[in-house]
A protein has these predicted regions:
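Aromatic/acidic, Gly/Pro-rich catalytic loop(s) in extracytoplasmic/lumenal soluble domains
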Residues: 2-7, 515-634
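Transmembrane alpha-helix segments characteristic
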Residues: 50-55, 159, 320-321, 328-349, ...
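Transmembrane-lumen/periplasm boundary regions of multi-pass, lipid-linked membrane glycan transferases
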Residues: 84, 225-329, 351
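Short periplasmic/luminal acceptor-recognition loop of GT-C membrane glycosyltransferases, typified by
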Residues: 99, 448-452, 456-514, 520-537, ...
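Transmembrane-helix motifs of polytopic, lipid-linked glycan transferases
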Residues: 126, 130-151
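Membrane-interface transmembrane helices that cradle and orient dolichyl/undecaprenyl
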Residues: 149-151, 188-206, 214, 326-327, ...
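Short acidic/glycine- and proline-prone juxtamembrane loop motifs at membrane-interface regions
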Residues: 169-182, 354
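Transmembrane alpha-helical segments
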Residues: 217, 428-461
Protein backbone atom coordinates (compact mmCIF):
# COMPACT_ATOMS: atom_id res chain seq x y z
CA UNK A 1 0.00 0.00 0.00
CA UNK A 2 1.43 3.33 -1.08
CA UNK A 3 1.48 6.17 1.32
CA UNK A 4 1.11 9.82 0.57
CA UNK A 5 4.28 11.75 1.45
CA UNK A 6 3.89 14.02 4.35
CA UNK A 7 4.54 17.43 2.84
CA UNK A 8 4.49 18.97 6.24
CA UNK A 9 7.80 17.28 7.01
CA UNK A 10 9.56 18.94 4.04
CA UNK A 11 11.78 21.95 4.51
CA UNK A 12 10.14 24.93 2.83
CA UNK A 13 11.89 28.20 2.02
CA UNK A 14 11.38 30.95 4.51
CA UNK A 15 9.10 33.75 3.34
CA UNK A 16 10.86 36.92 2.32
CA UNK A 17 10.75 39.33 5.17
CA UNK A 18 9.33 42.73 4.29
CA UNK A 19 11.88 45.47 4.08
CA UNK A 20 11.85 47.79 7.05
CA UNK A 21 10.30 51.19 6.59
CA UNK A 22 13.69 52.79 7.10
CA UNK A 23 15.08 51.09 3.96
CA UNK A 24 13.70 53.72 1.60
CA UNK A 25 15.00 56.49 3.81
CA UNK A 26 18.46 54.87 3.86
CA UNK A 27 18.50 54.62 0.08
CA UNK A 28 17.44 58.25 -0.21
CA UNK A 29 20.22 59.28 2.17
CA UNK A 30 22.77 57.32 0.15
CA UNK A 31 21.57 58.92 -3.07
CA UNK A 32 21.70 62.35 -1.48
CA UNK A 33 25.23 61.71 -0.24
CA UNK A 34 26.29 60.56 -3.71
CA UNK A 35 24.84 63.69 -5.31
CA UNK A 36 26.44 65.90 -2.68
CA UNK A 37 29.82 64.26 -3.22
CA UNK A 38 29.53 64.79 -6.96
CA UNK A 39 28.55 68.41 -6.46
CA UNK A 40 31.55 68.98 -4.21
CA UNK A 41 33.88 67.31 -6.69
CA UNK A 42 32.61 69.51 -9.55
CA UNK A 43 31.77 72.61 -7.54
CA UNK A 44 33.85 74.97 -9.67
CA UNK A 45 32.30 73.77 -12.91
CA UNK A 46 28.80 73.94 -11.46
CA UNK A 47 29.35 77.54 -10.40
CA UNK A 48 30.66 78.42 -13.86
CA UNK A 49 27.73 76.72 -15.58
CA UNK A 50 25.33 78.50 -13.24
CA UNK A 51 26.73 81.77 -14.59
CA UNK A 52 26.98 80.84 -18.28
CA UNK A 53 23.73 78.92 -18.83
CA UNK A 54 21.40 81.82 -17.93
CA UNK A 55 23.25 83.98 -20.46
CA UNK A 56 22.83 81.30 -23.11
CA UNK A 57 19.18 80.79 -22.15
CA UNK A 58 18.39 84.49 -22.54
CA UNK A 59 20.12 84.83 -25.90
CA UNK A 60 18.57 81.67 -27.31
CA UNK A 61 15.19 81.98 -25.61
CA UNK A 62 14.23 85.58 -26.32
CA UNK A 63 12.43 85.84 -29.68
CA UNK A 64 13.35 82.27 -30.61
CA UNK A 65 10.15 82.02 -32.66
CA UNK A 66 10.70 85.32 -34.46
CA UNK A 67 14.25 84.94 -35.74
CA UNK A 68 15.06 83.22 -37.99
CA UNK A 69 11.87 83.56 -39.96
CA UNK A 70 10.14 80.65 -41.64
CA UNK A 71 12.87 80.32 -44.24
CA UNK A 72 12.62 76.60 -45.02
CA UNK A 73 9.88 74.02 -45.32
CA UNK A 74 11.94 71.52 -43.36
CA UNK A 75 10.80 72.91 -40.01
CA UNK A 76 7.17 72.53 -41.01
CA UNK A 77 7.78 69.07 -42.42
CA UNK A 78 9.24 67.74 -39.16
CA UNK A 79 6.45 69.39 -37.16
CA UNK A 80 3.84 67.87 -39.49
CA UNK A 81 5.41 64.44 -39.20
CA UNK A 82 5.44 64.75 -35.42
CA UNK A 83 1.75 65.73 -35.56
CA UNK A 84 1.06 62.67 -37.70
CA UNK A 85 2.80 60.45 -35.17
CA UNK A 86 0.95 61.95 -32.22
CA UNK A 87 -2.56 61.99 -33.66
CA UNK A 88 -2.66 59.63 -36.65
CA UNK A 89 -0.22 56.97 -35.40
CA UNK A 90 1.67 57.32 -38.67
CA UNK A 91 5.34 58.01 -39.21
CA UNK A 92 4.63 60.83 -41.66
CA UNK A 93 1.70 62.87 -42.90
CA UNK A 94 2.36 61.56 -46.40
CA UNK A 95 4.20 58.43 -47.53
CA UNK A 96 7.28 57.79 -45.41
CA UNK A 97 10.01 57.08 -47.94
CA UNK A 98 13.04 56.61 -45.65
CA UNK A 99 14.50 60.04 -46.35
CA UNK A 100 15.62 60.16 -42.69
CA UNK A 101 15.19 57.83 -39.72
CA UNK A 102 12.15 58.97 -37.78
CA UNK A 103 13.68 59.26 -34.32
CA UNK A 104 14.03 63.04 -34.60
CA UNK A 105 10.39 63.87 -35.10
CA UNK A 106 9.44 61.07 -32.71
CA UNK A 107 11.22 63.11 -30.02
CA UNK A 108 9.31 66.20 -31.15
CA UNK A 109 6.06 64.23 -30.91
CA UNK A 110 6.94 63.07 -27.39
CA UNK A 111 7.60 66.66 -26.36
CA UNK A 112 4.39 68.01 -27.89
CA UNK A 113 2.41 65.16 -26.34
CA UNK A 114 3.78 65.86 -22.86
CA UNK A 115 3.35 69.63 -23.14
CA UNK A 116 0.26 69.82 -25.39
CA UNK A 117 2.54 71.78 -27.68
CA UNK A 118 0.47 71.73 -30.86
CA UNK A 119 -2.56 73.28 -29.17
CA UNK A 120 -0.68 75.46 -26.68
CA UNK A 121 2.01 77.10 -28.82
CA UNK A 122 1.34 79.84 -31.36
CA UNK A 123 2.19 77.53 -34.27
CA UNK A 124 3.35 73.96 -34.76
CA UNK A 125 6.82 75.18 -35.68
CA UNK A 126 6.88 77.20 -32.45
CA UNK A 127 6.33 74.02 -30.44
CA UNK A 128 9.15 72.27 -32.29
CA UNK A 129 11.47 75.24 -31.70
CA UNK A 130 10.74 75.06 -27.98
CA UNK A 131 12.28 71.61 -27.96
CA UNK A 132 15.31 72.88 -29.88
CA UNK A 133 15.84 75.47 -27.14
CA UNK A 134 15.83 72.84 -24.41
CA UNK A 135 18.09 70.52 -26.38
CA UNK A 136 20.55 73.34 -26.94
CA UNK A 137 20.91 73.90 -23.20
CA UNK A 138 21.64 70.20 -22.79
CA UNK A 139 24.16 70.39 -25.64
CA UNK A 140 25.93 73.28 -23.91
CA UNK A 141 26.41 71.26 -20.72
CA UNK A 142 27.63 68.28 -22.73
CA UNK A 143 30.06 70.43 -24.73
CA UNK A 144 31.51 71.89 -21.54
CA UNK A 145 31.84 68.44 -20.01
CA UNK A 146 33.51 67.09 -23.14
CA UNK A 147 35.98 69.96 -23.12
CA UNK A 148 36.90 69.23 -19.51
CA UNK A 149 37.32 65.51 -20.23
CA UNK A 150 39.63 66.39 -23.13
CA UNK A 151 41.85 68.38 -20.79
CA UNK A 152 40.62 71.94 -21.34
CA UNK A 153 40.82 74.16 -18.29
CA UNK A 154 37.55 75.55 -17.01
CA UNK A 155 38.07 78.98 -18.55
CA UNK A 156 38.61 77.56 -22.02
CA UNK A 157 35.82 74.98 -21.72
CA UNK A 158 33.50 77.84 -20.77
CA UNK A 159 34.86 79.87 -23.69
CA UNK A 160 34.03 77.01 -26.06
CA UNK A 161 30.50 76.91 -24.63
CA UNK A 162 30.01 80.64 -25.19
CA UNK A 163 31.21 80.79 -28.79
CA UNK A 164 29.22 77.63 -29.56
CA UNK A 165 26.07 79.39 -28.33
CA UNK A 166 26.51 83.08 -29.09
CA UNK A 167 27.74 82.89 -32.67
CA UNK A 168 25.06 84.35 -34.99
CA UNK A 169 25.61 81.30 -37.19
CA UNK A 170 24.79 79.09 -34.21
CA UNK A 171 21.75 81.17 -33.30
CA UNK A 172 20.40 80.88 -36.83
CA UNK A 173 20.60 77.11 -37.12
CA UNK A 174 20.28 76.01 -33.49
CA UNK A 175 16.98 77.85 -33.07
CA UNK A 176 15.36 76.17 -36.07
CA UNK A 177 13.62 72.80 -35.80
CA UNK A 178 16.28 70.79 -37.63
CA UNK A 179 17.06 67.14 -37.12
CA UNK A 180 20.73 68.14 -37.03
CA UNK A 181 20.26 69.81 -33.64
CA UNK A 182 18.79 66.64 -32.18
CA UNK A 183 21.53 64.50 -33.70
CA UNK A 184 24.30 66.79 -32.39
CA UNK A 185 22.94 66.61 -28.85
CA UNK A 186 23.03 62.79 -28.87
CA UNK A 187 26.44 62.88 -30.57
CA UNK A 188 27.93 65.04 -27.82
CA UNK A 189 26.45 62.71 -25.21
CA UNK A 190 28.15 59.77 -26.94
CA UNK A 191 31.52 61.57 -26.95
CA UNK A 192 31.18 62.45 -23.27
CA UNK A 193 30.57 58.79 -22.41
CA UNK A 194 33.45 57.63 -24.62
CA UNK A 195 35.84 60.00 -22.82
CA UNK A 196 34.54 59.04 -19.38
CA UNK A 197 37.34 58.75 -16.81
CA UNK A 198 35.62 55.67 -15.39
CA UNK A 199 36.47 53.66 -18.54
CA UNK A 200 33.65 51.31 -17.61
CA UNK A 201 31.62 48.88 -19.65
CA UNK A 202 28.48 50.86 -18.77
CA UNK A 203 29.98 54.08 -20.15
CA UNK A 204 30.85 52.31 -23.40
CA UNK A 205 27.35 50.89 -23.66
CA UNK A 206 25.92 54.37 -23.17
CA UNK A 207 28.28 55.74 -25.82
CA UNK A 208 27.01 53.17 -28.31
CA UNK A 209 23.41 53.82 -27.33
CA UNK A 210 23.69 57.59 -27.70
CA UNK A 211 25.49 57.19 -31.02
CA UNK A 212 22.60 55.02 -32.20
CA UNK A 213 20.11 57.66 -31.03
CA UNK A 214 22.10 60.21 -33.01
CA UNK A 215 21.76 58.02 -36.11
CA UNK A 216 18.03 57.69 -35.51
CA UNK A 217 17.84 61.49 -35.44
CA UNK A 218 20.08 62.24 -38.44
CA UNK A 219 21.76 59.46 -40.34
CA UNK A 220 24.72 61.59 -41.44
CA UNK A 221 26.10 61.59 -37.89
CA UNK A 222 27.44 58.10 -38.60
CA UNK A 223 30.34 59.94 -40.24
CA UNK A 224 31.56 60.65 -36.71
CA UNK A 225 31.60 56.98 -35.71
CA UNK A 226 35.31 56.37 -36.48
CA UNK A 227 36.28 59.35 -34.35
CA UNK A 228 34.07 58.17 -31.51
CA UNK A 229 35.64 54.72 -31.61
CA UNK A 230 39.17 56.19 -31.59
CA UNK A 231 38.27 58.37 -28.60
CA UNK A 232 36.93 55.31 -26.80
CA UNK A 233 40.18 53.49 -27.60
CA UNK A 234 42.29 56.41 -26.36
CA UNK A 235 40.52 56.32 -22.99
CA UNK A 236 40.53 52.54 -22.67
CA UNK A 237 41.52 50.42 -19.72
CA UNK A 238 43.42 47.35 -21.04
CA UNK A 239 41.85 45.20 -18.35
CA UNK A 240 38.30 45.51 -19.72
CA UNK A 241 38.84 46.75 -23.28
CA UNK A 242 37.47 43.55 -24.82
CA UNK A 243 34.17 43.92 -22.95
CA UNK A 244 34.06 47.67 -23.55
CA UNK A 245 34.25 47.43 -27.32
CA UNK A 246 31.78 44.53 -27.43
CA UNK A 247 29.20 46.45 -25.43
CA UNK A 248 29.79 49.61 -27.45
CA UNK A 249 29.36 47.88 -30.81
CA UNK A 250 26.54 45.68 -29.54
CA UNK A 251 24.41 48.61 -28.37
CA UNK A 252 25.22 50.63 -31.47
CA UNK A 253 24.49 47.92 -34.03
CA UNK A 254 21.51 46.55 -32.14
CA UNK A 255 19.67 49.87 -31.96
CA UNK A 256 20.63 50.98 -35.46
CA UNK A 257 19.65 47.58 -36.82
CA UNK A 258 16.05 48.15 -35.74
CA UNK A 259 15.77 50.57 -38.67
CA UNK A 260 16.66 47.80 -41.13
CA UNK A 261 14.32 45.37 -39.38
CA UNK A 262 11.51 47.91 -39.63
CA UNK A 263 11.99 48.22 -43.39
CA UNK A 264 12.21 44.45 -43.77
CA UNK A 265 9.04 43.90 -41.74
CA UNK A 266 7.15 46.24 -44.06
CA UNK A 267 8.66 44.57 -47.16
CA UNK A 268 10.35 47.86 -47.98
CA UNK A 269 13.98 46.89 -47.55
CA UNK A 270 14.63 46.43 -51.27
CA UNK A 271 13.20 48.25 -54.23
CA UNK A 272 10.13 46.77 -55.87
CA UNK A 273 7.02 47.75 -57.78
CA UNK A 274 4.37 49.74 -55.99
CA UNK A 275 6.21 50.66 -52.80
CA UNK A 276 9.02 52.77 -51.41
CA UNK A 277 12.21 51.14 -50.17
CA UNK A 278 15.16 51.79 -47.90
CA UNK A 279 17.50 50.61 -50.65
CA UNK A 280 16.17 53.22 -53.09
CA UNK A 281 16.35 56.02 -50.50
CA UNK A 282 19.97 55.22 -49.59
CA UNK A 283 20.98 55.00 -53.24
CA UNK A 284 19.27 58.31 -54.00
CA UNK A 285 20.85 60.06 -51.03
CA UNK A 286 24.36 58.81 -51.82
CA UNK A 287 24.50 58.60 -55.60
CA UNK A 288 21.42 59.83 -57.46
CA UNK A 289 20.72 63.11 -55.69
CA UNK A 290 21.55 66.11 -57.83
CA UNK A 291 24.81 67.70 -56.66
CA UNK A 292 24.78 71.30 -55.54
CA UNK A 293 28.04 72.10 -57.31
CA UNK A 294 31.55 72.99 -56.26
CA UNK A 295 32.29 75.45 -53.49
CA UNK A 296 34.87 76.99 -55.83
CA UNK A 297 32.19 77.82 -58.42
CA UNK A 298 30.70 81.20 -57.52
CA UNK A 299 27.49 80.33 -59.32
CA UNK A 300 26.83 77.04 -57.53
CA UNK A 301 24.39 76.35 -54.73
CA UNK A 302 27.24 75.05 -52.57
CA UNK A 303 29.07 78.35 -52.88
CA UNK A 304 25.90 80.26 -51.95
CA UNK A 305 25.34 78.04 -48.91
CA UNK A 306 28.90 78.54 -47.64
CA UNK A 307 28.65 82.25 -48.41
CA UNK A 308 25.49 82.48 -46.29
CA UNK A 309 27.35 80.83 -43.40
CA UNK A 310 30.17 83.35 -43.61
CA UNK A 311 27.74 86.26 -43.87
CA UNK A 312 26.28 85.22 -40.53
CA UNK A 313 29.65 84.59 -38.86
CA UNK A 314 33.00 84.55 -40.67
CA UNK A 315 34.99 83.76 -37.52
CA UNK A 316 33.98 80.67 -35.55
CA UNK A 317 34.19 77.95 -38.18
CA UNK A 318 37.27 79.38 -39.90
CA UNK A 319 39.05 79.87 -36.57
CA UNK A 320 38.22 76.30 -35.58
CA UNK A 321 39.52 74.91 -38.88
CA UNK A 322 42.74 76.91 -38.58
CA UNK A 323 43.23 75.72 -35.00
CA UNK A 324 42.52 72.10 -35.90
CA UNK A 325 45.65 71.77 -38.05
CA UNK A 326 48.24 72.21 -35.27
CA UNK A 327 46.02 70.37 -32.79
CA UNK A 328 46.53 67.18 -34.79
CA UNK A 329 49.88 66.97 -33.00
CA UNK A 330 48.18 66.98 -29.59
CA UNK A 331 46.84 63.56 -28.74
CA UNK A 332 44.09 64.62 -26.37
CA UNK A 333 42.50 66.91 -29.00
CA UNK A 334 43.45 64.93 -32.10
CA UNK A 335 40.05 63.31 -32.53
CA UNK A 336 37.96 66.50 -32.45
CA UNK A 337 40.41 68.33 -34.73
CA UNK A 338 40.46 65.46 -37.23
CA UNK A 339 36.66 65.29 -37.27
CA UNK A 340 36.39 69.03 -37.94
CA UNK A 341 38.90 68.82 -40.79
CA UNK A 342 37.01 65.82 -42.18
CA UNK A 343 33.77 67.83 -42.21
CA UNK A 344 35.59 70.70 -43.87
CA UNK A 345 36.93 68.37 -46.55
CA UNK A 346 33.46 67.05 -47.36
CA UNK A 347 32.44 70.54 -48.45
CA UNK A 348 34.82 70.24 -51.41
CA UNK A 349 33.33 67.05 -52.77
CA UNK A 350 31.05 67.48 -55.75
CA UNK A 351 27.90 66.40 -53.95
CA UNK A 352 24.82 67.81 -52.30
CA UNK A 353 25.46 70.26 -49.46
CA UNK A 354 22.42 70.93 -47.23
CA UNK A 355 22.10 74.27 -45.48
CA UNK A 356 22.19 72.82 -41.91
CA UNK A 357 25.42 70.90 -42.63
CA UNK A 358 27.36 73.45 -40.60
CA UNK A 359 25.37 72.60 -37.46
CA UNK A 360 27.52 69.56 -36.70
CA UNK A 361 30.71 71.57 -37.32
CA UNK A 362 29.96 74.17 -34.65
CA UNK A 363 30.75 72.18 -31.46
CA UNK A 364 34.01 70.84 -32.89
CA UNK A 365 35.01 74.28 -34.18
CA UNK A 366 34.38 75.75 -30.72
CA UNK A 367 36.42 73.02 -29.03
CA UNK A 368 39.32 73.44 -31.47
CA UNK A 369 39.41 77.23 -31.20
CA UNK A 370 39.36 77.14 -27.41
CA UNK A 371 41.58 74.06 -27.30
CA UNK A 372 44.41 75.75 -29.19
CA UNK A 373 44.44 78.62 -26.70
CA UNK A 374 44.43 76.12 -23.86
CA UNK A 375 47.33 74.22 -25.42
CA UNK A 376 49.41 77.35 -26.00
CA UNK A 377 48.93 78.73 -22.50
CA UNK A 378 51.47 77.03 -20.21
CA UNK A 379 50.15 75.05 -17.31
CA UNK A 380 51.75 73.74 -14.15
CA UNK A 381 52.70 70.10 -14.18
CA UNK A 382 49.93 68.23 -12.30
CA UNK A 383 50.62 66.63 -8.99
CA UNK A 384 51.32 62.98 -9.47
CA UNK A 385 49.03 60.42 -7.92
CA UNK A 386 48.37 56.73 -8.09
CA UNK A 387 45.40 57.21 -10.45
CA UNK A 388 47.37 58.12 -13.60
CA UNK A 389 47.61 61.82 -13.32
CA UNK A 390 45.71 63.02 -10.29
CA UNK A 391 42.75 65.36 -10.14
CA UNK A 392 42.27 69.07 -9.73
CA UNK A 393 39.76 70.78 -7.48
CA UNK A 394 37.03 70.08 -10.00
CA UNK A 395 37.42 66.35 -9.90
CA UNK A 396 38.94 66.19 -13.39
CA UNK A 397 41.91 64.07 -14.39
CA UNK A 398 44.94 65.79 -15.86
CA UNK A 399 46.23 62.63 -17.47
CA UNK A 400 44.13 60.45 -19.75
CA UNK A 401 45.42 56.98 -19.14
CA UNK A 402 46.61 56.70 -22.75
CA UNK A 403 50.30 56.77 -22.09
CA UNK A 404 50.62 60.27 -23.45
CA UNK A 405 48.89 62.53 -20.98
CA UNK A 406 52.05 63.35 -19.04
CA UNK A 407 53.92 64.14 -22.25
CA UNK A 408 51.16 66.53 -23.32
CA UNK A 409 51.33 68.26 -19.97
CA UNK A 410 55.10 68.72 -20.21
CA UNK A 411 54.89 70.14 -23.71
CA UNK A 412 52.06 72.51 -22.81
CA UNK A 413 53.83 73.62 -19.65
CA UNK A 414 56.72 74.75 -21.81
CA UNK A 415 59.34 73.00 -19.74
CA UNK A 416 62.17 70.93 -21.07
CA UNK A 417 65.27 69.39 -19.63
CA UNK A 418 68.52 71.12 -20.46
CA UNK A 419 66.98 74.55 -21.15
CA UNK A 420 68.26 77.54 -19.16
CA UNK A 421 65.79 78.87 -16.63
CA UNK A 422 65.71 82.35 -18.21
CA UNK A 423 64.90 80.82 -21.61
CA UNK A 424 62.02 78.84 -20.14
CA UNK A 425 60.70 81.93 -18.36
CA UNK A 426 60.90 84.03 -21.53
CA UNK A 427 59.17 81.35 -23.59
CA UNK A 428 56.46 80.98 -20.97
CA UNK A 429 55.89 84.73 -20.85
CA UNK A 430 55.73 84.91 -24.63
CA UNK A 431 53.07 82.20 -24.76
CA UNK A 432 51.03 83.83 -22.03
CA UNK A 433 51.20 87.16 -23.82
CA UNK A 434 50.15 85.56 -27.10
CA UNK A 435 47.11 83.92 -25.49
CA UNK A 436 46.13 87.13 -23.70
CA UNK A 437 46.42 89.11 -26.94
CA UNK A 438 44.39 86.49 -28.82
CA UNK A 439 41.64 86.49 -26.19
CA UNK A 440 41.41 90.29 -26.01
CA UNK A 441 41.53 90.66 -29.79
CA UNK A 442 38.86 88.00 -30.24
CA UNK A 443 36.56 89.61 -27.69
CA UNK A 444 36.85 93.01 -29.38
CA UNK A 445 36.41 91.62 -32.90
CA UNK A 446 33.51 89.33 -32.04
CA UNK A 447 31.75 92.00 -30.01
CA UNK A 448 32.01 94.38 -32.98
CA UNK A 449 30.64 91.82 -35.44
CA UNK A 450 28.24 89.78 -33.30
CA UNK A 451 26.51 92.47 -31.23
CA UNK A 452 24.29 93.93 -34.00
CA UNK A 453 23.45 90.44 -35.25
CA UNK A 454 22.52 89.21 -31.78
CA UNK A 455 20.43 92.36 -31.28
CA UNK A 456 18.60 91.52 -34.50
CA UNK A 457 18.05 87.97 -33.30
CA UNK A 458 16.54 89.25 -30.05
CA UNK A 459 14.23 91.88 -31.57
CA UNK A 460 13.29 91.13 -35.20
CA UNK A 461 10.10 89.10 -35.68
CA UNK A 462 10.75 87.70 -39.14
CA UNK A 463 8.18 84.92 -38.65
CA UNK A 464 5.23 87.32 -38.30
CA UNK A 465 4.19 87.15 -41.99
CA UNK A 466 3.75 83.38 -41.83
CA UNK A 467 1.75 83.48 -38.58
CA UNK A 468 -0.38 86.41 -39.78
CA UNK A 469 -1.16 84.68 -43.06
CA UNK A 470 -2.40 81.57 -41.27
CA UNK A 471 -4.58 83.60 -38.90
CA UNK A 472 -6.05 85.65 -41.75
CA UNK A 473 -6.84 82.55 -43.81
CA UNK A 474 -8.61 80.84 -40.92
CA UNK A 475 -10.57 84.00 -40.10
CA UNK A 476 -11.68 84.92 -43.64
CA UNK A 477 -11.81 81.73 -45.75
CA UNK A 478 -14.71 79.63 -44.52
CA UNK A 479 -15.68 77.60 -47.59
CA UNK A 480 -14.44 74.09 -48.22
CA UNK A 481 -12.16 74.95 -51.10
CA UNK A 482 -8.94 73.02 -51.55
CA UNK A 483 -5.86 74.91 -50.38
CA UNK A 484 -2.31 74.27 -51.51
CA UNK A 485 0.25 75.44 -48.98
CA UNK A 486 3.75 74.89 -47.70
CA UNK A 487 4.49 72.58 -44.80
CA UNK A 488 5.02 75.55 -42.47
CA UNK A 489 1.27 76.21 -42.40
CA UNK A 490 0.04 72.66 -43.11
CA UNK A 491 -0.11 71.55 -39.47
CA UNK A 492 -1.66 74.81 -38.24
CA UNK A 493 -4.46 74.61 -40.80
CA UNK A 494 -5.04 70.95 -39.96
CA UNK A 495 -5.13 71.58 -36.21
CA UNK A 496 -7.74 74.32 -36.64
CA UNK A 497 -10.02 71.98 -38.56
CA UNK A 498 -9.43 73.00 -42.17
CA UNK A 499 -11.22 70.42 -44.32
CA UNK A 500 -10.52 69.01 -46.78
CA UNK A 501 -7.01 68.64 -45.53
CA UNK A 502 -4.55 71.13 -47.01
CA UNK A 503 -2.06 69.78 -49.53
CA UNK A 504 1.68 70.35 -49.34
CA UNK A 505 2.52 71.89 -52.71
CA UNK A 506 5.39 69.47 -53.40
CA UNK A 507 3.08 66.46 -53.12
CA UNK A 508 0.61 67.81 -55.67
CA UNK A 509 3.03 67.15 -58.52
CA UNK A 510 5.47 64.60 -57.14
CA UNK A 511 3.17 62.14 -55.36
CA UNK A 512 1.09 60.15 -57.89
CA UNK A 513 -1.57 59.26 -55.31
CA UNK A 514 -2.13 62.90 -54.39
CA UNK A 515 -2.06 63.97 -58.01
CA UNK A 516 -4.80 61.43 -58.76
CA UNK A 517 -7.24 63.54 -56.72
CA UNK A 518 -6.71 66.46 -59.09
CA UNK A 519 -7.87 65.07 -62.46
CA UNK A 520 -8.16 68.56 -63.96
CA UNK A 521 -4.80 69.70 -62.69
CA UNK A 522 -4.59 73.30 -61.56
CA UNK A 523 -8.32 73.81 -62.18
CA UNK A 524 -9.08 71.63 -59.15
CA UNK A 525 -7.13 73.98 -56.87
CA UNK A 526 -9.09 76.73 -55.10
CA UNK A 527 -6.55 78.54 -52.91
CA UNK A 528 -2.81 78.95 -52.63
CA UNK A 529 -1.17 80.04 -49.38
CA UNK A 530 2.56 80.28 -49.89
CA UNK A 531 5.37 82.45 -51.14
CA UNK A 532 6.45 82.21 -54.74
CA UNK A 533 8.98 79.39 -55.03
CA UNK A 534 12.12 79.95 -57.11
CA UNK A 535 12.01 79.04 -60.77
CA UNK A 536 14.07 75.89 -60.15
CA UNK A 537 11.36 74.62 -57.79
CA UNK A 538 8.48 75.65 -60.05
CA UNK A 539 10.05 73.60 -62.84
CA UNK A 540 9.51 70.49 -60.67
CA UNK A 541 5.88 71.34 -59.80
CA UNK A 542 4.15 72.39 -63.05
CA UNK A 543 0.61 72.08 -61.64
CA UNK A 544 1.49 74.51 -58.86
CA UNK A 545 3.12 76.81 -61.39
CA UNK A 546 -0.05 76.84 -63.52
CA UNK A 547 -2.20 77.48 -60.45
CA UNK A 548 -0.01 80.45 -59.54
CA UNK A 549 -0.30 81.77 -63.09
CA UNK A 550 -4.12 81.59 -63.01
CA UNK A 551 -4.57 83.09 -59.54
CA UNK A 552 -5.15 86.50 -58.02
CA UNK A 553 -3.82 87.79 -54.71
CA UNK A 554 -6.38 88.09 -51.93
CA UNK A 555 -3.96 89.16 -49.21
CA UNK A 556 -0.22 89.66 -49.02
CA UNK A 557 2.01 89.53 -45.95
CA UNK A 558 5.58 90.66 -45.41
CA UNK A 559 5.95 92.57 -48.70
CA UNK A 560 4.91 89.55 -50.70
CA UNK A 561 6.80 87.01 -48.61
CA UNK A 562 3.55 85.08 -48.09
CA UNK A 563 0.52 85.47 -50.36
CA UNK A 564 -2.97 84.05 -50.13
CA UNK A 565 -4.26 83.54 -53.66
CA UNK A 566 -7.55 82.50 -55.21
CA UNK A 567 -7.26 80.28 -58.28
CA UNK A 568 -9.72 81.30 -61.02
CA UNK A 569 -10.62 78.77 -63.72
CA UNK A 570 -11.66 80.21 -67.11
CA UNK A 571 -14.93 82.14 -66.87
CA UNK A 572 -14.82 82.50 -63.08
CA UNK A 573 -14.54 85.69 -61.08
CA UNK A 574 -13.04 86.31 -57.68
CA UNK A 575 -16.47 87.17 -56.23
CA UNK A 576 -17.91 83.76 -57.18
CA UNK A 577 -17.52 81.08 -54.48
CA UNK A 578 -15.27 78.15 -55.41
CA UNK A 579 -18.22 75.74 -55.22
CA UNK A 580 -19.77 77.49 -58.25
CA UNK A 581 -16.51 77.73 -60.20
CA UNK A 582 -16.11 74.33 -61.83
CA UNK A 583 -13.04 73.55 -63.89
CA UNK A 584 -15.12 73.28 -67.05
CA UNK A 585 -17.87 71.25 -68.69
CA UNK A 586 -16.47 68.09 -67.15
CA UNK A 587 -16.06 69.59 -63.73
CA UNK A 588 -16.04 67.59 -60.55
CA UNK A 589 -19.32 67.22 -58.63
CA UNK A 590 -20.37 70.22 -56.57
CA UNK A 591 -19.70 70.11 -52.86
CA UNK A 592 -22.58 69.27 -50.60
CA UNK A 593 -24.13 71.92 -48.43
CA UNK A 594 -23.07 70.33 -45.16
CA UNK A 595 -19.42 71.15 -45.79
CA UNK A 596 -18.25 67.65 -46.70
CA UNK A 597 -15.99 67.73 -49.72
CA UNK A 598 -16.85 65.37 -52.56
CA UNK A 599 -13.25 65.78 -53.73
CA UNK A 600 -10.84 65.08 -50.85
CA UNK A 601 -7.52 66.84 -51.08
CA UNK A 602 -5.22 64.11 -49.88
CA UNK A 603 -7.21 60.91 -49.82
CA UNK A 604 -7.11 60.67 -46.02
CA UNK A 605 -8.73 62.45 -43.17
CA UNK A 606 -12.40 63.06 -42.47
CA UNK A 607 -13.48 66.42 -43.93
CA UNK A 608 -15.92 67.07 -41.16
CA UNK A 609 -13.51 66.66 -38.25
CA UNK A 610 -13.82 69.32 -35.61
CA UNK A 611 -11.33 72.10 -35.12
CA UNK A 612 -8.18 71.00 -33.39
CA UNK A 613 -9.05 67.29 -33.59
CA UNK A 614 -6.95 64.80 -35.52
CA UNK A 615 -8.36 63.60 -38.80
CA UNK A 616 -9.34 59.94 -38.92
CA UNK A 617 -7.45 57.66 -41.25
CA UNK A 618 -9.49 56.47 -44.22
CA UNK A 619 -7.19 53.97 -45.85
CA UNK A 620 -3.65 52.85 -46.38
CA UNK A 621 -0.86 55.41 -46.60
CA UNK A 622 -0.13 56.81 -50.00
CA UNK A 623 2.29 54.63 -51.89
CA UNK A 624 4.80 55.78 -54.47
CA UNK A 625 8.27 55.03 -55.72
CA UNK A 626 9.59 58.47 -56.48
CA UNK A 627 11.17 60.58 -53.77
CA UNK A 628 10.09 64.07 -52.87
CA UNK A 629 12.78 66.71 -52.74
CA UNK A 630 12.46 68.92 -49.70
CA UNK A 631 13.80 72.43 -50.21
CA UNK A 632 16.87 72.97 -48.11
CA UNK A 633 16.64 69.44 -46.80
CA UNK A 634 19.45 67.54 -45.22
Amino acid sequence: MTTVPDVFDETLPHPVAPRPAAWAADRARLLGAWVAAGARAHRSSLVLLAVLLPVVAVVHGVNFDGWPGRVTDDEGTYAAQAYSMQYWNRIAHYTYWYDHPFGGWLLIAIYTKLTDGFHRAATAVTAARELMFLLHLVSCVLLYRLGRLLGLRRFFAGLALLVFSLSPLALWYQRMAFLDNIGVMWLLAAFVCAASPRRSVAAAALAGTFMAFSFWSKETTLLFLPGLYVLLWQHRDPRNWRFVRRNFLGCLLGICGIYILYAAAKNELFEGPGHVSLEWAVRWQLFDRAPSGSVLDTGSDTYNVVRSWLDLDPYLVLAGIAAAVPLLALRRLRVVSALLLMQFGFIFRNGYLPNPYVTAMLPFAALCAAGLLDAVLPRALPRMSTDHGGRDGDGERHGHGDGDGHGDAVRERGGGRGMPEWTTAAWTGLRRGAVAAAVVGSVVTLAWDWTPKIHKALTLDASAPSRDATRWFLAHIHDDGTVITDDIAWTDLTIHGRRPLPVWFYKLDLDPEVRGHFPHGWKDVDYLMMGKPPDSVLAEVPIVAEALHHSVVLKSFGNGEIEIRRVLPPGCRVDIPPARCGPGPDSVPARSGDGDAQRPASGRGHPGAGAGEPARDSGDPLRRRDGVLSPGGG
